[in-house]
Amino acid sequence: MERFILDTSVFTNPDTFNQFARDAVEATRIFLQLARRADAEFFIPGSVYEEFRLMKDLASLGGDFESVVKIRSPRRYSLTIPSEFLYELIHEVRHRIDRGLRIAEEHARMAAQPGTVADQGALITRLRERYRETLRRGIVDSREDIDVLLLAYELDGVLLSADEGLRKWADKVGVKIILPQHLRRVLENLTSCSRPQK
């Protein structure tokens, strides 16, 4: 039986949840119906579940969600991960910090030149967008991301996430991945596989 580890993006990213319904809560309900019948187990770390509950009102689905999806955090204090993963992560973060610094310097020079900046607000907005893109895209950038990654690694599970950085780093440590655009079809296939053959 396959084990699937869920990230909030499955339920909050429109490109992913639109496979099920236009509304995120309705999409979650349909996901749960399919997951309940699938020959699979579903997990979500506690930190990710809390994040999800803050983003979406699950009052009507909380009991259903918790009866289908197991809420379990990774065993952070006993789990062993390859040291190369940590080495690469630190190298990547350092590289991104340096790139972010160059972006900040570029915008500081633009602001210092007389007559080049008509709208300081627009300059700051542009700086924030470029800085955020440089530092966060394609990397695990939160405790919740790490919890999902570690739990998938620990359980030898399949990662379900629309987060490109999380998928990239999961692949580095050998975690199985399903692309988010295939989620509904995979669930339907697992549902049909669990039915007895005639």
UniProtKB/Swiss-Prot annotation:
It catalyses: Endonucleolytic cleavage of RNA, removing 5'-extranucleotides from tRNA precursor. RNA-free RNase P that catalyzes the removal of the 5'-leader sequence from pre-tRNA to produce the mature 5'-terminus. The keyword Hydrolase applies. InterPro entries: PIN-like_dom_sf, RNA_free_RNase_P. CDD domains: PIN_VapC-like. This is RNA-free ribonuclease P. Keywords: Endonuclease, Hydrolase, Nuclease, tRNA processing. Belongs to the HARP family. NCBIfam families: PRK04358.1-5 (NF003344), RNA_lig_partner (TIGR03875). Its EC number is 3.1.26.5. PANTHER family: RNA-FREE RIBONUCLEASE P (PTHR41173:SF1), UPF0278 PROTEIN TK1425 (PTHR41173). GO terms for molecular function: ribonuclease P activity. GO terms for biological process: tRNA 5'-leader removal.
